[in-house]
Protein backbone atom coordinates (compact mmCIF):
# COMPACT_ATOMS: atom_id res chain seq x y z
CA UNK A 1 0.00 0.00 0.00
CA UNK A 2 2.76 2.48 0.94
CA UNK A 3 4.71 1.48 -2.15
CA UNK A 4 1.80 2.52 -4.35
CA UNK A 5 1.28 5.76 -2.42
CA UNK A 6 4.93 6.65 -2.97
CA UNK A 7 4.62 5.83 -6.67
CA UNK A 8 1.52 8.04 -6.94
CA UNK A 9 3.04 10.78 -4.72
CA UNK A 10 -0.01 10.48 -2.47
CA UNK A 11 2.01 9.43 0.59
CA UNK A 12 1.92 12.04 3.36
CA UNK A 13 5.43 12.97 4.50
CA UNK A 14 6.04 14.10 8.08
CA UNK A 15 9.40 15.75 8.71
CA UNK A 16 10.42 16.34 12.31
CA UNK A 17 13.01 19.07 12.70
CA UNK A 18 13.11 22.05 10.33
CA UNK A 19 16.73 23.09 10.61
CA UNK A 20 19.24 23.47 7.80
CA UNK A 21 18.39 19.91 6.63
CA UNK A 22 14.73 19.43 7.54
CA UNK A 23 13.54 22.68 5.98
CA UNK A 24 15.13 22.04 2.55
CA UNK A 25 14.05 18.37 2.67
CA UNK A 26 10.44 19.23 3.48
CA UNK A 27 10.48 21.83 0.71
CA UNK A 28 11.93 19.32 -1.75
CA UNK A 29 9.18 16.79 -1.03
CA UNK A 30 6.56 19.53 -1.36
CA UNK A 31 8.18 20.73 -4.59
CA UNK A 32 7.74 17.24 -6.01
CA UNK A 33 4.04 17.07 -5.21
CA UNK A 34 3.99 15.30 -1.84
CA UNK A 35 1.69 16.58 0.88
CA UNK A 36 4.27 17.41 3.54
CA UNK A 37 3.99 18.28 7.22
CA UNK A 38 7.02 20.13 8.56
CA UNK A 39 7.12 19.93 12.36
CA UNK A 40 9.39 21.88 14.70
CA UNK A 41 9.03 22.71 18.39
CA UNK A 42 10.74 26.09 17.96
CA UNK A 43 8.17 28.81 17.11
CA UNK A 44 10.93 31.27 16.23
CA UNK A 45 12.28 28.91 13.59
CA UNK A 46 8.80 28.49 12.12
CA UNK A 47 8.35 32.26 12.06
CA UNK A 48 11.69 32.72 10.29
CA UNK A 49 10.67 30.20 7.63
CA UNK A 50 7.20 31.65 7.12
CA UNK A 51 8.54 35.21 6.85
CA UNK A 52 11.10 34.20 4.23
CA UNK A 53 14.02 35.18 6.45
CA UNK A 54 15.86 31.90 5.80
CA UNK A 55 14.70 31.24 2.23
CA UNK A 56 18.36 31.32 1.14
CA UNK A 57 18.59 27.82 2.65
CA UNK A 58 16.57 26.67 -0.36
CA UNK A 59 19.02 28.06 -2.94
CA UNK A 60 20.09 24.54 -3.87
CA UNK A 61 16.57 23.50 -4.91
CA UNK A 62 15.13 26.74 -6.33
CA UNK A 63 15.67 28.27 -9.78
CA UNK A 64 17.95 31.31 -10.03
CA UNK A 65 15.48 33.19 -12.22
CA UNK A 66 13.44 35.45 -9.93
CA UNK A 67 10.05 34.79 -11.55
CA UNK A 68 10.53 31.02 -11.73
CA UNK A 69 11.83 31.06 -8.16
CA UNK A 70 8.65 32.71 -6.90
CA UNK A 71 6.50 30.26 -8.86
CA UNK A 72 8.33 27.30 -7.35
CA UNK A 73 8.06 28.77 -3.85
CA UNK A 74 4.30 29.10 -4.35
CA UNK A 75 4.11 25.40 -5.31
CA UNK A 76 6.08 24.44 -2.22
CA UNK A 77 3.90 26.53 0.08
CA UNK A 78 0.78 24.88 -1.37
CA UNK A 79 1.98 21.40 -0.36
CA UNK A 80 3.88 22.23 2.84
CA UNK A 81 2.13 22.59 6.20
CA UNK A 82 4.44 24.09 8.83
CA UNK A 83 3.44 23.37 12.41
CA UNK A 84 4.55 23.03 16.01
CA UNK A 85 1.53 20.91 16.91
CA UNK A 86 2.18 17.16 17.09
CA UNK A 87 -1.41 16.35 16.17
CA UNK A 88 -0.78 17.50 12.60
CA UNK A 89 1.54 14.50 12.12
CA UNK A 90 -1.23 11.95 12.66
CA UNK A 91 -1.84 11.23 8.96
CA UNK A 92 1.80 10.78 7.99
CA UNK A 93 2.73 7.64 6.05
CA UNK A 94 6.44 8.43 6.26
CA UNK A 95 8.37 10.07 9.10
CA UNK A 96 11.78 11.66 8.50
CA UNK A 97 13.87 12.51 11.55
CA UNK A 98 16.00 15.62 10.98
CA UNK A 99 16.61 16.86 14.51
CA UNK A 100 19.96 18.05 15.92
CA UNK A 101 22.33 15.53 17.48
CA UNK A 102 24.73 17.81 19.37
CA UNK A 103 27.35 17.12 22.03
CA UNK A 104 27.11 17.38 25.79
CA UNK A 105 29.59 19.57 27.64
CA UNK A 106 31.81 16.52 28.17
CA UNK A 107 31.86 15.97 24.37
CA UNK A 108 29.74 12.81 24.40
CA UNK A 109 26.61 12.37 22.24
CA UNK A 110 23.52 14.28 23.31
CA UNK A 111 20.66 12.27 21.86
CA UNK A 112 17.81 13.87 23.80
CA UNK A 113 16.29 15.48 20.66
CA UNK A 114 16.45 12.18 18.81
CA UNK A 115 14.90 10.30 21.73
CA UNK A 116 12.08 12.82 22.18
CA UNK A 117 11.36 12.74 18.46
CA UNK A 118 11.07 8.95 18.50
CA UNK A 119 8.59 9.24 21.37
CA UNK A 120 6.56 11.75 19.37
CA UNK A 121 6.48 9.44 16.34
CA UNK A 122 5.45 6.57 18.61
CA UNK A 123 2.15 8.32 19.24
CA UNK A 124 1.23 8.22 15.55
CA UNK A 125 3.05 5.10 14.37
CA UNK A 126 0.82 2.62 12.58
CA UNK A 127 1.29 -0.56 10.59
CA UNK A 128 2.92 0.02 7.22
CA UNK A 129 4.57 3.31 8.22
CA UNK A 130 8.14 4.09 7.12
CA UNK A 131 10.51 5.85 9.54
CA UNK A 132 13.74 7.30 8.14
CA UNK A 133 16.51 8.72 10.32
CA UNK A 134 18.63 11.40 8.62
CA UNK A 135 20.20 12.94 11.74
CA UNK A 136 23.88 12.08 12.14
CA UNK A 137 24.48 9.33 14.71
CA UNK A 138 27.22 6.83 15.51
CA UNK A 139 27.20 3.35 13.92
CA UNK A 140 24.65 1.15 15.66
CA UNK A 141 22.53 3.96 17.11
CA UNK A 142 19.47 3.26 14.94
CA UNK A 143 19.35 -0.30 16.27
CA UNK A 144 20.31 0.63 19.84
CA UNK A 145 18.35 3.87 20.36
CA UNK A 146 15.74 4.46 17.66
CA UNK A 147 14.34 0.95 17.18
CA UNK A 148 13.55 0.22 20.88
CA UNK A 149 11.91 3.62 21.36
CA UNK A 150 9.70 3.19 18.30
CA UNK A 151 8.79 -0.35 19.36
CA UNK A 152 7.32 1.04 22.58
CA UNK A 153 4.32 1.66 20.32
CA UNK A 154 3.72 -2.10 20.43
CA UNK A 155 4.70 -2.46 16.77
CA UNK A 156 7.73 -4.42 15.55
CA UNK A 157 10.38 -2.83 13.31
CA UNK A 158 10.78 -4.66 10.01
CA UNK A 159 7.46 -6.45 10.41
CA UNK A 160 4.81 -3.91 11.37
CA UNK A 161 6.67 -0.79 10.27
CA UNK A 162 9.74 -0.06 8.18
CA UNK A 163 12.95 1.52 9.48
CA UNK A 164 15.71 3.15 7.45
CA UNK A 165 18.80 5.29 7.97
CA UNK A 166 19.75 7.70 5.19
CA UNK A 167 22.44 10.20 6.21
CA UNK A 168 21.78 13.83 5.44
CA UNK A 169 24.20 15.17 2.87
CA UNK A 170 23.98 18.90 2.45
CA UNK A 171 26.55 21.61 1.90
CA UNK A 172 24.99 24.93 2.94
CA UNK A 173 25.83 27.71 0.52
CA UNK A 174 26.81 25.30 -2.27
CA UNK A 175 24.61 26.21 -5.24
CA UNK A 176 26.27 23.68 -7.54
CA UNK A 177 25.45 20.67 -5.38
CA UNK A 178 21.86 21.12 -4.29
CA UNK A 179 19.91 18.35 -2.56
CA UNK A 180 18.53 16.93 -5.79
CA UNK A 181 21.99 16.30 -7.23
CA UNK A 182 23.63 14.75 -4.15
CA UNK A 183 23.46 10.92 -4.20
CA UNK A 184 21.33 9.52 -1.36
CA UNK A 185 22.68 6.62 0.69
CA UNK A 186 19.94 4.31 2.03
CA UNK A 187 20.28 1.55 4.61
CA UNK A 188 17.53 -0.32 6.40
CA UNK A 189 16.62 -2.87 9.03
CA UNK A 190 15.56 -5.21 6.22
CA UNK A 191 15.32 -5.27 2.43
CA UNK A 192 11.73 -4.02 2.41
CA UNK A 193 12.76 -0.95 4.39
CA UNK A 194 15.63 -0.22 1.99
CA UNK A 195 13.41 -0.70 -1.05
CA UNK A 196 10.66 1.59 0.24
CA UNK A 197 13.06 4.34 1.33
CA UNK A 198 14.93 4.06 -1.98
CA UNK A 199 11.73 4.36 -4.01
CA UNK A 200 10.73 7.40 -1.95
CA UNK A 201 14.04 9.22 -2.40
CA UNK A 202 14.13 8.36 -6.10
CA UNK A 203 11.13 10.68 -6.39
CA UNK A 204 13.13 13.70 -5.23
CA UNK A 205 16.84 13.08 -5.98
CA UNK A 206 18.72 11.98 -9.08
CA UNK A 207 20.71 9.11 -7.58
CA UNK A 208 19.89 6.63 -4.80
CA UNK A 209 22.52 4.20 -3.49
CA UNK A 210 21.15 1.31 -1.38
CA UNK A 211 23.59 -0.30 1.08
CA UNK A 212 23.47 -3.59 2.94
CA UNK A 213 22.67 -2.41 6.47
CA UNK A 214 21.78 0.42 8.81
CA UNK A 215 25.34 0.34 10.16
CA UNK A 216 26.94 0.79 6.74
CA UNK A 217 24.74 3.83 6.09
CA UNK A 218 25.58 5.28 9.52
CA UNK A 219 29.30 4.62 9.01
CA UNK A 220 29.24 6.23 5.57
CA UNK A 221 28.33 9.56 7.12
CA UNK A 222 31.02 9.19 9.76
CA UNK A 223 33.67 8.33 7.16
CA UNK A 224 32.76 11.27 4.92
CA UNK A 225 33.04 13.81 7.71
CA UNK A 226 36.08 12.26 9.36
CA UNK A 227 37.85 12.34 6.00
CA UNK A 228 37.34 16.09 5.97
CA UNK A 229 38.15 16.52 9.65
CA UNK A 230 41.51 14.74 9.54
CA UNK A 231 42.58 16.37 6.28
CA UNK A 232 41.68 19.83 7.55
CA UNK A 233 43.64 19.05 10.72
CA UNK A 234 46.60 17.90 8.63
CA UNK A 235 46.75 21.11 6.63
CA UNK A 236 46.15 23.23 9.74
CA UNK A 237 49.09 21.54 11.43
CA UNK A 238 51.29 21.81 8.36
CA UNK A 239 50.41 25.48 7.90
CA UNK A 240 51.98 26.31 11.27
CA UNK A 241 55.17 24.48 10.28
CA UNK A 242 55.26 26.03 6.80
CA UNK A 243 54.85 29.51 8.31
CA UNK A 244 57.95 28.98 10.45
CA UNK A 245 59.86 27.63 7.45
CA UNK A 246 58.97 30.70 5.38
CA UNK A 247 56.81 28.60 3.04
CA UNK A 248 53.48 29.77 1.59
CA UNK A 249 50.94 27.04 2.44
CA UNK A 250 48.40 28.33 -0.07
CA UNK A 251 50.88 28.30 -2.95
CA UNK A 252 52.02 24.84 -1.90
CA UNK A 253 48.44 23.54 -1.99
CA UNK A 254 47.87 25.11 -5.41
CA UNK A 255 51.02 23.45 -6.74
CA UNK A 256 50.11 20.06 -5.26
CA UNK A 257 46.63 20.37 -6.78
CA UNK A 258 48.18 20.19 -10.25
CA UNK A 259 48.66 16.46 -9.69
CA UNK A 260 45.76 14.86 -11.58
CA UNK A 261 45.42 11.91 -9.19
CA UNK A 262 45.91 11.02 -5.54
CA UNK A 263 45.55 14.54 -4.09
CA UNK A 264 42.48 16.42 -2.88
CA UNK A 265 43.10 19.98 -1.68
CA UNK A 266 42.08 21.04 1.82
CA UNK A 267 42.78 24.49 3.20
CA UNK A 268 43.89 25.92 6.54
CA UNK A 269 41.56 28.14 8.52
CA UNK A 270 40.64 29.45 11.96
CA UNK A 271 38.99 26.18 12.99
CA UNK A 272 36.03 24.07 11.91
CA UNK A 273 32.40 24.90 12.57
CA UNK A 274 28.86 23.98 11.63
CA UNK A 275 26.73 20.99 12.46
CA UNK A 276 29.03 18.12 11.45
CA UNK A 277 32.81 18.46 11.26
CA UNK A 278 33.46 19.67 14.85
CA UNK A 279 31.02 17.14 16.32
CA UNK A 280 31.13 13.89 14.39
CA UNK A 281 34.63 12.77 15.46
CA UNK A 282 33.40 12.74 19.05
CA UNK A 283 30.39 10.59 18.12
CA UNK A 284 32.70 8.01 16.58
CA UNK A 285 35.19 8.26 19.44
CA UNK A 286 32.35 7.61 21.90
CA UNK A 287 31.31 4.44 20.08
CA UNK A 288 34.93 3.33 19.60
CA UNK A 289 35.67 3.74 23.30
CA UNK A 290 32.54 1.74 24.16
CA UNK A 291 33.81 -1.08 21.96
CA UNK A 292 37.33 -0.94 23.41
CA UNK A 293 38.95 0.62 20.34
CA UNK A 294 41.41 3.52 20.40
CA UNK A 295 41.14 5.98 17.51
CA UNK A 296 44.15 8.13 18.39
CA UNK A 297 44.45 9.68 14.93
CA UNK A 298 40.82 10.83 14.93
CA UNK A 299 41.19 12.20 18.47
CA UNK A 300 44.35 14.14 17.63
CA UNK A 301 42.79 15.63 14.49
CA UNK A 302 39.76 16.83 16.45
CA UNK A 303 42.05 18.45 19.03
CA UNK A 304 44.09 20.25 16.35
CA UNK A 305 40.98 21.73 14.75
CA UNK A 306 39.50 22.68 18.10
CA UNK A 307 42.63 24.64 19.05
CA UNK A 308 42.91 26.66 15.84
CA UNK A 309 40.95 29.68 17.18
CA UNK A 310 43.58 30.01 19.91
CA UNK A 311 46.27 29.91 17.24
CA UNK A 312 44.49 32.81 15.54
CA UNK A 313 44.82 34.82 18.74
CA UNK A 314 48.52 33.92 18.82
CA UNK A 315 48.86 35.30 15.26
CA UNK A 316 47.02 38.46 16.30
CA UNK A 317 49.40 38.97 19.23
CA UNK A 318 52.42 38.27 17.02
CA UNK A 319 51.26 40.75 14.37
CA UNK A 320 50.54 43.46 16.94
CA UNK A 321 54.09 43.15 18.24
CA UNK A 322 55.34 44.26 14.82
CA UNK A 323 53.51 47.53 15.51
CA UNK A 324 54.79 47.73 19.09
CA UNK A 325 51.28 47.03 20.38
CA UNK A 326 49.85 44.54 22.87
CA UNK A 327 46.58 42.63 23.02
CA UNK A 328 45.50 44.41 26.17
CA UNK A 329 46.03 47.92 24.81
CA UNK A 330 44.65 47.34 21.32
CA UNK A 331 41.22 47.73 19.74
CA UNK A 332 39.79 45.04 17.46
CA UNK A 333 37.32 44.52 14.65
CA UNK A 334 36.34 40.90 14.01
CA UNK A 335 34.79 40.38 10.59
CA UNK A 336 32.57 37.34 10.22
CA UNK A 337 30.53 35.36 12.74
CA UNK A 338 29.05 32.44 10.81
CA UNK A 339 31.00 29.20 10.51
CA UNK A 340 31.71 29.61 6.80
CA UNK A 341 31.29 31.84 3.78
CA UNK A 342 27.83 33.07 2.77
CA UNK A 343 25.78 30.94 5.19
CA UNK A 344 23.59 31.97 8.15
CA UNK A 345 24.66 29.12 10.45
CA UNK A 346 26.65 30.10 13.56
CA UNK A 347 26.79 26.69 15.25
CA UNK A 348 30.20 25.90 16.73
CA UNK A 349 31.73 28.75 14.76
CA UNK A 350 35.43 29.44 15.50
CA UNK A 351 34.55 33.14 15.68
CA UNK A 352 32.86 32.59 19.03
CA UNK A 353 36.08 31.44 20.68
CA UNK A 354 38.14 34.22 19.10
CA UNK A 355 35.66 36.92 20.16
CA UNK A 356 35.20 35.49 23.66
CA UNK A 357 38.94 35.23 24.31
CA UNK A 358 39.76 38.68 22.91
CA UNK A 359 36.96 40.23 24.99
CA UNK A 360 38.62 38.83 28.12
CA UNK A 361 41.72 40.84 27.24
CA UNK A 362 40.47 43.96 25.47
CA UNK A 363 37.47 46.13 26.27
CA UNK A 364 37.49 47.65 22.80
CA UNK A 365 36.19 45.07 20.35
CA UNK A 366 33.49 45.23 17.72
CA UNK A 367 32.18 42.54 15.41
CA UNK A 368 30.42 42.62 12.06
CA UNK A 369 28.71 40.00 9.94
CA UNK A 370 26.33 40.87 7.09
CA UNK A 371 24.32 37.66 7.57
CA UNK A 372 23.63 37.49 11.30
CA UNK A 373 22.96 39.74 14.28
CA UNK A 374 24.82 37.41 16.66
CA UNK A 375 27.81 39.12 18.29
CA UNK A 376 28.58 36.86 21.28
CA UNK A 377 28.25 39.83 23.59
CA UNK A 378 30.44 42.22 21.61
CA UNK A 379 29.28 45.50 20.10
CA UNK A 380 28.34 45.75 16.44
CA UNK A 381 27.59 48.38 13.84
CA UNK A 382 28.04 48.87 10.10
CA UNK A 383 31.19 47.57 8.44
CA UNK A 384 32.65 51.08 8.23
CA UNK A 385 31.93 51.88 11.87
CA UNK A 386 33.17 48.49 13.06
CA UNK A 387 36.64 48.87 11.54
CA UNK A 388 36.95 52.62 12.11
CA UNK A 389 39.90 53.52 14.33
CA UNK A 390 40.76 49.90 15.18
CA UNK A 391 44.31 48.73 15.78
CA UNK A 392 43.67 45.27 14.38
CA UNK A 393 41.22 43.81 11.86
CA UNK A 394 40.68 40.03 12.17
CA UNK A 395 38.98 38.49 9.14
CA UNK A 396 37.33 35.25 10.26
CA UNK A 397 34.88 34.58 7.40
CA UNK A 398 35.36 35.30 3.70
CA UNK A 399 31.81 36.44 2.92
CA UNK A 400 31.16 37.65 -0.64
CA UNK A 401 29.84 40.84 0.97
CA UNK A 402 33.36 41.90 1.91
CA UNK A 403 34.53 41.55 -1.70
CA UNK A 404 31.49 43.36 -3.02
CA UNK A 405 32.07 46.23 -0.58
CA UNK A 406 35.77 46.70 -1.37
CA UNK A 407 37.20 45.68 1.98
CA UNK A 408 40.78 46.44 0.93
CA UNK A 409 39.86 50.03 0.08
CA UNK A 410 38.15 50.47 3.44
CA UNK A 411 41.21 49.11 5.26
CA UNK A 412 43.44 51.53 3.37
CA UNK A 413 41.40 54.41 4.80
CA UNK A 414 42.38 53.39 8.33
CA UNK A 415 45.24 54.98 10.22
CA UNK A 416 48.80 53.88 9.39
CA UNK A 417 50.27 51.08 11.48
CA UNK A 418 46.99 49.16 11.48
CA UNK A 419 47.25 45.36 11.63
CA UNK A 420 45.25 42.89 9.56
CA UNK A 421 45.06 39.17 10.33
CA UNK A 422 43.48 37.19 7.49
CA UNK A 423 42.48 33.64 8.42
CA UNK A 424 41.09 32.76 4.98
CA UNK A 425 43.65 34.08 2.45
CA UNK A 426 40.86 36.37 1.29
CA UNK A 427 42.29 39.87 1.37
CA UNK A 428 44.46 40.92 -1.58
CA UNK A 429 47.53 42.18 0.26
CA UNK A 430 48.86 43.77 -2.94
CA UNK A 431 45.98 46.26 -2.75
CA UNK A 432 46.88 47.32 0.80
CA UNK A 433 49.09 50.28 1.63
CA UNK A 434 52.60 49.43 2.77
CA UNK A 435 51.84 51.02 6.14
CA UNK A 436 49.30 48.26 6.86
CA UNK A 437 50.78 45.24 8.66
CA UNK A 438 49.20 42.23 6.95
CA UNK A 439 49.40 38.65 8.21
CA UNK A 440 47.72 35.67 6.55
CA UNK A 441 47.31 32.33 8.30
CA UNK A 442 49.53 29.81 6.50
CA UNK A 443 51.87 32.40 5.00
CA UNK A 444 55.28 33.51 6.31
Language-model features: where?
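Structural/interface elements that position substrates and couple domains in central-metabolism enzymes
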Residues: 1-444
Amino acid sequence: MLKQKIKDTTAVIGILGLGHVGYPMSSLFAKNGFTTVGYDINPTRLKDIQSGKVVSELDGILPVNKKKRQEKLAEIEKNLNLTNEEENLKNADVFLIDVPTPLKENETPNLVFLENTCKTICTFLKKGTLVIVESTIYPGATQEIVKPLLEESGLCAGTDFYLSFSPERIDPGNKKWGLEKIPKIVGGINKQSVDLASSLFSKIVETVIPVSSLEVAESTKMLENLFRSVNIALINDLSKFFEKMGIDTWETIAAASSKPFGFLPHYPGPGVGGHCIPKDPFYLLYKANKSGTNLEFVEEAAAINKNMPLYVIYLVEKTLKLCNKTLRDSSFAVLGVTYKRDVLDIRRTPSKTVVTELCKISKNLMIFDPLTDETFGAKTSTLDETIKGKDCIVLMVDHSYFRENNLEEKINELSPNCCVVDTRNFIDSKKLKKSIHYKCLGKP
